[in-house]
Amino acid sequence: MKRFTNILVVFNNAIGAEDALEQAVSLARDNAARLTVAVVLRSTEASPQRIDETEKRLQRLSLGVQHAGVSEVDTLVLTGTPFLEAIRQVIRAEHDLVFACAEPDNVLKQIFFGSTATHLVRKCPCPVWIVKPTQPVPYKKILVAVDPKISTSEDQINSLIMDLAASLASRDHAVLHIMHAWDVDGNDLDSIRSEITTEQREAILERHHDKHLLALNNLLAGYPTSELDRRVHLPRGRPEQAISRLVRQEQIDLIVMGSVGRIGIPGYFIGDTAETVLGSERCSILTVKPNGFKTPVLSH
């Protein structure tokens, strides 16, 4: 899989940082990609001594990365708010993928400030891979959550995440679970909530199921079953609930999904599904934005 050529790892002291680095090294080696390992120190932590110690630590780390087979390795010590400095680095150096580890649950911190991972998924212009600790590598089971529509922009993001998930499944020889959660919409939603016969209700549900199945089959037509061990799921219901059920039932290792639910206010929202999954699931998550996404973070 030669998709990524310029990878950034946001490295910190959290549990799971080593796991994120290990996965980034593996992908960089497979892609012959440049790898940048960055530590972001908050301004209150960035004493000259702390910066010097961090630089020396990164130098030692880079030798290990090179020994693992990555020839182009850069290290950086940045100062400021972690997610802001990481995104600014992405803009400056045109990174095409960011690795970060999930932070330990801290409800108050996330309520008032938001986690670094959540901010990256919301606002980073390139794909973001959030690694949760102790995930097995290579992955055995990958879930891609799609929502095929008629809209060109939505078709585009579905194709992006399908391409990426299929490439990863092929690389790791993993089972690829493809899920599209659907529900009744429009006037039919009012109809099934009203007093109609069982036969009428079932006819409405069948019509919507078939419509979504057709859209999903059209999307999957470009991904031959002979090349992938794939399982297709078409549950009715809210996407975040369907994803959670499937993650637990199938013991999914990685979720690949889009992170922008609506186009309109760049960067200041995240699709409800992606944010819910990011905060609740214990597997790693790779999120992708549509082409043309504009980050609200300035490069300086």
What is each stretch, according to the model?
Residues C101-H119, L254-G279:
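Glycine-rich, Arg-bearing micro-motifs that act as flexible, cationic patches
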